[in-house]
Amino acid sequence: MVMAALSLVAACWGRAAADESVQLPAAPGSSVRARETMVSVTMATSEWIQFFKEAGIPPGPAVNYAVMFVDNRIQKSMLLDLNKEIMNELGVTVVGDIIAILKHAKVVHRQDMCKAATESVPCSPSPLAGEIRRGTSAASRMITNSLNHDSPPSTPPRRPDTSTSKISVTVSNKMAAKSAKATAALARREEESLAVPAKRRRVTAEMEGKYVINMPKGTTPRTRKILEQQQAAKGLHRTSVFDRLGAETKADTTTGSKPTGVFSRLGATPETDEDLAWDSDNDSSSSVLQYAGVLKKLGRGPAKASPQPALTVKAKATSSATTAAAPTLRRLALSSRSGLERKPESLSKVSIIKRLGAAALVPEAQDSQVTSTKSKSSAEVKVTIKRTLVGPRGSSSSEGLGAQMDHAGTVSVFKRLGRRTF
């Protein structure tokens, strides 16, 4: 397509040249100039066709626009001066083509400026730079200054030839891309050097696998010591709370399960089954047990006061003579001595029969008579005694045997035995 457009343009210029040759006389050397003009026009047309193609114009309109630009002698340096009115005068009426051409004109102008700047800067450094650096004396500095002044001025940037403009633009674009890549790589390297080194990733036990632990075999003194410590630690078993508090006794575990009688609760010594059966028979046969010799007159003189606390008895006597109550209380206090004298053993070992006394075969229906130790008082007094324990709780059970009750009703075992000893 491009070749066809070029051939068309060449044919047009050829016909115009033929007409001129017919009308005007041929001048010497005119054919050479015409040929050069044709070549330059063809190259200019090809450049403008390429320009319009890069701007996005279709090939047909691009050829027409290129011919119009060549006919109106539009140069590349005039691209920034183009506007909508000028484009309409040049025959470009399509609005989209106008906008595309104006945008691409700005881009091409920028590329030409970059190319001119790169060509103006020398590629290799001047050979006198090393000598200037090495020159330390005044003479060497004068020589270098004179050489700098005498050096020819730098040539102005020459307009590139139209034949090599496309190649130069492509090379400048490639150089700019390479320089941009180099700067990006340098910036990336600097960032990597300044960046903090990444922390090492932690390897978990699942990723690494199972550990193999080699236990000491006891070949060295240190390993033997470690094994001894482990054995000692294994020997110390952990004890429970019950082991640390002590084992429970059999009596503690069986106390609540077995029924206990009144005699076991009073602290009596365990007796045989025959004695217990005989005691129960005596209790059932006699409703009232009489105390033998409780109020008898003691043959011995008054003994010294017992170290244990005496039993305080509150007596209520119904009699016409009130002076006979005091001797009776004295005899009751003295009668407790007989119970204390026959206590050689501990109270827990005294049988129930001994503590109760011998049972009378025939219960007396009449009240007992109280006789005073004094010879002056011979009157009979009927005494009703009400015992009340006021002493300490730990008093002996034998102290409650010093009085005889005067009612003929049934007396329970607890009343006959007295309070429980602790």
Swiss-Prot record:
<feature type="cross-link" description="Glycyl lysine isopeptide (Lys-Gly) (interchain with G-Cter in SUMO2)">
    <location>
        <position position="250"/>
    </location>
</feature>
<dbReference type="InterPro" id="IPR013761">
    <property type="entry name" value="SAM/pointed_sf"/>
</dbReference>
<feature type="modified residue" description="Phosphoserine">
    <location>
        <position position="126"/>
    </location>
</feature>
<dbReference type="GO" id="GO:0005634">
    <property type="term" value="C:nucleus"/>
</dbReference>
<feature type="modified residue" description="Phosphoserine">
    <location>
        <position position="124"/>
    </location>
</feature>
<dbReference type="Pfam" id="PF18017">
    <property type="entry name" value="SAM_4"/>
</dbReference>
<dbReference type="Pfam" id="PF17740">
    <property type="entry name" value="DUF5577"/>
</dbReference>
<feature type="modified residue" description="Phosphoserine">
    <location>
        <position position="306"/>
    </location>
</feature>
<feature type="region of interest" description="Disordered">
    <location>
        <begin position="251"/>
        <end position="285"/>
    </location>
</feature>
<feature type="region of interest" description="Disordered">
    <location>
        <begin position="299"/>
        <end position="324"/>
    </location>
</feature>
<dbReference type="InterPro" id="IPR041477">
    <property type="entry name" value="DUF5577"/>
</dbReference>
<feature type="modified residue" description="Phosphoserine">
    <location>
        <position position="351"/>
    </location>
</feature>
<feature type="compositionally biased region" description="Low complexity">
    <location>
        <begin position="310"/>
        <end position="324"/>
    </location>
</feature>
<keyword id="KW-0832">Ubl conjugation</keyword>
<protein>
    <recommendedName>
        <fullName>Uncharacterized protein C19orf47</fullName>
    </recommendedName>
</protein>
<feature type="region of interest" description="Disordered">
    <location>
        <begin position="144"/>
        <end position="166"/>
    </location>
</feature>
<dbReference type="InterPro" id="IPR039161">
    <property type="entry name" value="C19orf47-like"/>
</dbReference>
<keyword id="KW-1017">Isopeptide bond</keyword>
<feature type="modified residue" description="Phosphoserine">
    <location>
        <position position="151"/>
    </location>
</feature>
<feature type="compositionally biased region" description="Acidic residues">
    <location>
        <begin position="271"/>
        <end position="282"/>
    </location>
</feature>
<dbReference type="GO" id="GO:0005654">
    <property type="term" value="C:nucleoplasm"/>
</dbReference>
<dbReference type="InterPro" id="IPR040772">
    <property type="entry name" value="C19orf47_SAM"/>
</dbReference>
<feature type="modified residue" description="Phosphoserine">
    <location>
        <position position="280"/>
    </location>
</feature>
<keyword id="KW-0597">Phosphoprotein</keyword>
